[in-house]
Design a protein with these regions (language model features):
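A short, N-terminal "cap"/entry segment at the start of jelly-roll beta-barrel domains
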Residues: 1-44, 48-55, 123-133
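A short hydrophobic beta-strand segment most commonly corresponding to one strand
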Residues: 1-2, 64, 104-125
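Histidine-centered active-site/metal-ligand motif
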Residues: 56-58, 97
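Short acidic-glycine-tyrosine-enriched beta hairpin
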Residues: 77-96
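Glycine- and acidic-residue-biased ligand/ion/polar-headgroup-sensing regions
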Residues: 59-73, 77-78
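Asparagine-centered strand-capping/turn motif at beta-strand->loop junctions
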Residues: 99-102
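Charged, often glycine-enriched C-terminal and inter-domain segments
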Residues: 21, 66, 91-92
Length: 133
């Protein structure tokens, strides 16, 4: 079921009230896998306003991020950028990166992972707002 919320221009923006049962929740929001196969995985990621993921890197995969709704603050190596709806970026393997929602509405993006190993344990955290290892 969809409901409408208002953006900064007072335009109606649909927001999901129900999260699929296969969604994995995190302190920063949630994600679920839309599709996966050999050497790829596609996720829908939602980041709560004012929250961010850890500063991290992956040894075995690259990530492509496409913003669907909201504004993403992306750290990729030493570069920091803002991405809006319909903009994207690429995170190579072994690159420190972080995703943040600086806005007041949920950030929604599609993540496409490619690599030989796509397990959730392929993560090295350098900083984490939630004290995860």
């Amino acid at each position: 079921m969809l409901r409408a919320v208002r953006d900064v221009n007072d335009a109606a923006v649909p927001a999901l009230e129900l999260v699929p049962s296969q969604a994995e929740t995190r302190p920063w929001g949630s994600f679920w896998v839309l599709d996966e196969g050999p050497m790829y995985k596609i996720k829908r990621i939602e980041v709560k306003p004012g929250h961010r993921l850890s500063l991290q890197m992956h040894y075995h995969r690259s990530e492509h991020w496409i913003v669907v709704r909201g504004t993403a603050k992306v750290t990729r190596g030493e570069e920091v950028m803002l991405l809006s709806s319909n903009e994207s970026t690429y995170i190579p393997p072994c690159t420190k990166h972080r995703l943040e929602n600086p806005g007041t509405l949920p950030l929604v993006l599609i993540e496409v992972q490619n690599g030989e190993y796509l397990g959730e344990d392929d993560i090295v955290r350098f900083e984490d707002d939630y004290a995860r290892q």
